[in-house]
Amino acid sequence: MFNKDMYALGSKRSSIRELFEYGKKCANEVGAENVFDFSLGNPNVPAPDCVKDALVELANSCETLHGYTSAQGDVAVREAVAKNISRRFGVDVGKDLIYMTCGAAASLCITLRALNENNSEFVVLAPYFPEYKVFIEAAGGKAVVADYDEKDFTPDLSTLEQAIGKNTAAVIVNSPNNPSGVVYSKDTIEKIADVLTRKSKEFGHPIFIIADEPYRELAYDVEVPYIMNFYGDTIVCYSYSKSLSLPGERIGYIAVSPKADDAKNLYLAICGAGRALGYVCAPSTYQKVIEKCVDALPNLNAYRQNRDLLFNSLTKIGYDCVRPDGAFYLFVKALEDDANAFADKAKQLGLLLVPGDDFGAKGYVRIAYCVSYDMIKRSVPAFEKLFEQYESNKR
């Protein structure tokens, strides 16, 4: 006997991972140079030098490098993370409100489990990372989707209001956004905070913001508002996977706002959820790396150049694209209503694009441009050919 829901998840992979595996298979069959794999948000920019330096130093000097830390993370590491938040954003979180985790996915799963009570509802703002629904349901909650404004892919506040009810525990806010690359402005965050403040009073309990921030440092010439400064009942789920190009190392943290309702006990609930899920003692080596590299920032030049090349090339051809101010994704309007059919036609030209249906945005495809500049240049003729095929069918 086994759990049928888990079987369903295991037997049908996420559309992103499935496309990624398909790309590897195609590369083996026809040559990697003939496959333009834009499926997975896997950073192509190397980790900063400080990461390598820290690893060498730790390997030569730290006798407990591979040992256990405290369940919630090494004290010195949590102190370093807390001080970084205080320096950068002016929020005095303190080490006792920091929980080190195995990346943003673990942070989300722990937080959702900590907040869920009697089939709580969690609002996700479209477009959204598809695994949100998986994580919410695994925590015992129910996902409720709030729509987006089609003009700029920011949250539609009227549908957000309608989505919030008496059982709402939290709203997940992801900015810079995956898949659109949109960065929510200060004005947008203030409006979301206003809605949640009113709804919290209406229903007599706090409605939290879960700030999913793996792309916080990947913003081009715009400011990413720090949500704790706008809304007290905020829990930040952070990952170093994108900012330090460490996706395979699985390291991040949860930070509870000191202004959150019953913050200390909320943190204890997070500790309890981490224990129940087996997410204790995040990878100790990379905890210590983070302590030494906590102030490091990514080199955005490569991503900015990729964005500009891809956005300018596709819009010149005639594609309708959402200009991204952050992350490393370009959201492109499919050339037919059925984005899955469009992505299938793109496949025939070696272009691997993720349909937007799973992101809650039908009629779009996501392009992950965290690839080599050369690959983007070589892919442009394929995008041109794809566009020409649709244009010729109109004649």
Regions found by a protein language model. Give the residues of each.
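Short beta-strand to alpha-helix junction loop
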Residues: 70-73, 77
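A ubiquitous short alpha-helical element
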Residues: 65-68, 274
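PLP-dependent class I/II
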Residues: 1-19, 26-59, 76, 86-395
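Glycine-rich loop-to-alpha-helix module at the N-terminal edge of alpha/beta enzyme cores
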Residues: 38, 64-65, 80-83
